[in-house]
Amino acid sequence: GIKRMKVSNIQKGLLVRTMICAVSLAAACFFEASLNVQAAPRAQETGERVTVVIDPGHGGDNEGTLEGITKEKEMTMVTALAMYEELTKYDNVDVYLTHTDDVSMSLADRAQFAAERNADFLFSIHYNASVDHDLFGSEVWISSVQPYNAYGYQFGWEQMQQMKGMGLFLRGVKTKLKDNGDDYYGIIRESTARGIPSAIIEHCHVDEGRDIPYCQTEEDWKRFGREDALSVAKYFGLSDADTGVDYSAEADALPEVSLQSILPATIRDKTEPDICLLSLLNADYDTGEVTLEVTGTDYDCPMMYYD
């Protein structure tokens, strides 16, 4: 795609520096929630009743990121409790929280908690931040191991749909590996080792201007929990006889997946964009305004350029 931008207040002596800085524009591959999805059924088989474990991220001495309006552990607890309250309204679902008090709990213990309850899925609730405070958007981390990769991708796609509805930028459904090829994130690794599908939900970045409006108040954190519950309800096709809500059709309208190998869409694309061109269209030294044109193409994934 092509993006034109104007850089104001540029003096003659700074034009070259401005051009150099512009060349460093970053490219980010992102998950397109409106992708053409073949209506495939949920790959994960379950019994008549579904068991869900919600894990409020961090706790105790592990406070999570401190870059937001409050400690991450406080935000995740509010979100998890709201998610729990919403999910328990549906029929044929048992919902558990790994903890409800502000306590330290190892990742292995969280996964073991889910295993002891024969959980169909463990959802770890989190908020994000970045070193340079310049990243934004929502993402879901899942296992690289099949069939958990496929299960996680189908759920993550549903979660991204909900985040898109809120107006958040979608960073995607992804895997991250250690140097030895194992899953990087402990809660995912420990859950997979116990045969429990899992996903880390990183709702937004608490330290970046685009995302901050989404996570300022306790009501904001509760809203995320309700959206999470809706994602889970749609993924499992839950229903509520009292209200007439029935999401069984949604569980048959998920992305098509393979249980044989890791889904390419969940693998981080580390290659450079195929085309990345920067052109100077105009430089008005009287007004101090420079107009640049950026052309970018990446055949491996959708791409957005930003400065």
Task: Set out the residue ranges of the language-model regions.
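Active-site-proximal helix/loop segments of hydrolytic enzymes
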Residues: 32, 40-51, 74-268
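Extracellular repeat turn/loop positions enriched in glycine and acidic/polar residues, especially those
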Residues: 57
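Gram-positive cell-envelope targeting signals
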Residues: 1-45, 304
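Glycine- and acidic-residue-enriched helix-capping/strand-helix junction motifs
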Residues: 64-78
